[in-house]
A protein has these predicted regions:
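Residue-level marker for beta-strand->alpha-helix junctions and adjacent short loops that shape enzyme
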Residues: 168-169, 254, 296-297, 543-544, ...
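N-terminal cap/leader regions of alpha/beta-hydrolase-fold enzymes
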Residues: 199, 238, 302-304, 310-311, ...
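Cap/lid segment of the alpha/beta-hydrolase catalytic domain
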Residues: 129-216, 252-265, 490-580, 625-630
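Loop/turn elements at helix/coil->beta-strand transitions in domains of secreted/extracellular proteins
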Residues: 130-131, 157-160, 220-221, 242-246, ...
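Alpha/beta-hydrolase-fold serine-hydrolase catalytic core, especially in secreted/extracellular enzymes
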Residues: 1-118, 128, 194-200, 213, ...
């Protein structure tokens, strides 16, 4: 191996791409356990008193709110009783329960955020209320079903009860431009909201807290009780708002380290880095927390509907009572000598009599446990639950669309501290943005501390160049791998520029760098560049294996990481290795990628400044619209690529802002008119911001866009000229 001095022989056999994905899987499983044990580094608890403890955990509570997307100021709740055709709420008897009934039932609506309301049922005790409670069923339960169960029991016990509608797991309305998917409604909203720094969980927490805002006027004790998805909402609402003196969490609490296997609408950026259920419970203390362990909602996956697809896998299973008890004891242990008011109850179903006895005890007898769980018949004329759910779904979708439209202006404010007076000031003042992009959006892993241990082998040779497979260690179980093409005409002592040529989704290095494979959308571009005299390296990126790699993203996100958390150090290691080769010019190393490789072209060079330029092919876009639009048929809201969504990206970095981090280095877009990843108008709109930035810095010649009559493919005309100009010119 004359072109690989000092490189050991590569002896690995089999599918190296599958080996890479499997190794990252092992790494992330270890990291999940390790980081759970390291959470205390984020906590500065003072357990000398409850007052000091409350003050010491305030930053943690704020960070939890950020993780959950609870970041917007609410509007006044303005509770409204909904009037329906043919029924007057002022008329007694015929349309309302009898005077002997322990409570009355009203359909209500209240305001939450601009453009977002809540709808549900208000259960008003006949006697003066002794407490106010928000009761939340599972996502697939209607408020009427909750009123017929523990919600009604709470009202019969003397509580004023508000029961919000939650977005369910059906897929009836999940689609874009008439193209329907089998995504649960919760997933459909999650996708758009997540991209914009919000969450379906956070929106429903806000609905609960808006109810609490309304309850404030009554000056009564307040609590929250929920089952299943409602238990999740209740638990986190109580952790965030100290006005809630009691939380009953049923069918939810337990160890959270397998969050990646739960439905994707529970995926929460960086949650497990700082919070398990025990840590969240510690935010509820010293207030009362009752964990009612009963069978969780049975969810084996997304709806199975003929002709529909695109949903992410994910299931809900019931943990053992021992696992739940262990997590609750861990919560108690976090509080030192402070005595928490936590209780664990085993039950067959949510809202057991034993739970109500516990509520009676902790309320000092104000809330009386019933001998049985009485209910009141629903009055006639209540709004249609399905129509109400549709209104709430449509409204929440439109809420995400309003956020999407506003995002551009939020980003402008976010970027206000970048000084574009001249190139030097631009480079200086964008360093902080690069750091934030890497650490807060991509998720930064520590720099590798193990040697690269390069291994290689020759895999083919042509008249113009020789091809080698190269493997480099990055982290335990994580390696970089790709194909190096070395032209034959390099003179002794000569140093050539390098082009790193990146494949797309489900691709391999061979797709771009092996002349023996069949023609494809890459058109042998690494080989053609090698024929032009460039050294090329074609890495294997880990977006291969369908759900196997997408599960990596699921495991990574709760740790504040992503696929690109691995891809960035892989590429840095590759460039460091290339610099050691005697025929490589380490100052002239460029990037050129198609599709997911184009996605890489705006993210990796934005962080890895050893790349001297970047060419993005078949991916440049108004990326936030692409991910969040509920109108455009090319939106990722309707596809099976559920790993695409990056938390809060929309409010910080669109593709133009990513190119700001590449600037002043040269940057180019290659765009086929027929490429279905976007429309020319979107691409041009976003690129105009890039060109504007380069032009105003006086370096407009460093950025270009080429349109060509073609589909999703490497064109290799203008881009090749761009490489020649900036690497050799």
């Amino acid at each position: 191996m004359e072109h690989l001095p000092g490189v050991k022989p590569l002896t690995w056999k089999g599918d190296l791409a599958a080996r890479m994905v499997a190794g990252m899987d092992r790494y992330l499983r270890r990291a999940t356990a390790e980081r759970a044990a390291q959470r205390e580094r984020y906590w500065k608890r003072d357990t000398t008193s409850w007052e000091r403890h409350e003050k010491s955990i305030a930053p943690n509570r704020k960070r939890l709110a950020k993780c959950l997307g609870v970041v917007d100021d609410r509007v006044p709740a303005d509770m409204q009783v909904v009037a329906w055709a043919g029924t007057s709420l002022d008329r007694p008897s015929a349309e309302r329960p009898s005077e002997a009934a322990p409570y009355t039932i009203h359909a209500v609506r209240w305001h939450v955020l601009p453009g977002l309301t809540a709808e549900g049922l208000l259960l008003e005790p006949t006697a003066p209320a002794v407490a106010n409670v928000v009761a939340l069923g599972d996502a697939d339960q209607t408020p009427e079903q909750v009123a017929d169960g523990f919600g009604g029991a709470l009202a019969a016990s003397g509580c004023r009860v508000l029961i919000p509608t939650l977005i369910n797991r059906d897929c009836e309305w999940s689609g874009v431009a008439g193209i329907l998917t089998n995504q649960p409604h919760r997933e459909f909203i999650y996708r758009a909201a997540y991209e914009l720094g919000r969450h379906v969980i956070g929106a429903e927490i806000q609905k609960v807290l808006a109810a609490v805002d309304w309850f404030d006027q009554f000056r009564l004790p307040m609590g929250v009780m929920g089952y299943g998805e409602g238990g999740l909402i209740a638990f986190n609402a109580a952790a965030l708002d100290t006005r809630l003196g009691l939380a009953v969490v049923s069918g939810y609490f337990g160890p959270r380290e397998k969050l990646f296997a739960e439905p994707i609408y529970r995926n929460t950026w960086r949650l497990l880095e700082e919070f398990g259920d025990a840590e969240i419970a510690s935010l509820v203390a010293p207030r009362f927390l009752i964990v009612e362990h009963c069978p969780f909602p049975a969810v084996s996956g997304p709806p199975q509907v003929e002709g529909r697809s695109g949903a992410a896998p994910g299931a809900i299973t019931t943990p053992s009572v021992a696992a739940v008890e262990k997590e609750l004891k861990r919560a108690m242990g976090l509080l030192g000598d402070l005595p928490p008011s936590f209780g664990l109850i085993e039950a067959d179903a949510p809202g057991s009599l034993l739970t109500f006895e516990f509520i009676q005890e902790v309320s000092g007898g104000a809330v009386c446990a019933p001998d049985e769980l009485p209910t009141v018949p629903l009055p006639p004329g209540l709004p249609d639950p399905q129509a109400r759910l549709k209104r709430q779904f449509d409204e929440m979708v439109e809420w995400t669309q309003a956020l999407m439209r506003e995002a551009e202006y939020v980003r402008r404010d976010y970027w206000a501290k970048a000084d574009a007076t001249d190139v030097k000031l631009w480079e200086k003042t964008t360093k902080a943005y690069r750091k934030r992009f890497h650490e807060e959006v991509i998720g930064a892993l520590p720099a590798p501390d193990m040697p690269p241990n390069p291994r290689g082998r020759q895999v083919f040779a042509t008249e113009a160049y020789t091809g080698y497979e190269v493997v480099l260690d990055v982290y335990p179980d994580v390696f970089a791998y790709g194909i190096l093409l070395v032209p034959h005409d390099i003179a002794p002592g000569e140093r050539r520029p390098v082009v790193v040529c990146q494949h797309g989704l489900e691709g391999r290095p061979q797709d771009v760098a092996d002349p023996r494979i069949e023609e494809n959308c890459y058109h042998y571009f690494a080989c053609r560049l090698a024929q032009r005299g460039f050294v090329t390296f074609s890495p294997q990126n880990p977006y291969i294996g369908m759900d196997k790699f997408r599960v990596l993203q699921r495991m990574a996100n709760p740790l504040g990481l992503s696929l690109f958390s691995f891809i960035i150090p892989q590429h840095q290691r590759i460039l460091d290795f290339l610099k050691t080769l005697p025929y490589v010019d380490g100052k002239r190393m460029a990037f050129y990628g198609l599709s997911y490789g184009g996605k890489t072209a705006v993210r990796v060079p934005a962080v890895v400044t050893d790349y001297c330029l970047s060419v993005c092919s078949g991916d440049f876009n108004e990326w936030i619209w692409k991910n969040a639009s509920a109108r455009a048929p090319l939106s990722y809201l309707r596809t099976g690529e559920y790993e695409m969504f990056e938390f809060d990206l929309g409010m910080t970095f669109n593709y133009a802002e990513m190119t700001y981090l590449i600037c002043p280095r040269p940057f180019m877009v290659e765009r086929g008119h027929w490429d279905g990843v976007s429309w020319d108008e979107w691409v041009s709109y976003e690129f105009a911001k890039t060109r504007y930035r380069y032009d105003l810095l006086g370096i407009g010649e460093r950025t270009e866009i080429e349109y060509f009559n073609g589909p999703h493919e490497i064109n290799g005309v203008g881009a090749f000229a761009f490489l020649e100009k900036h690497l050799r010119g």
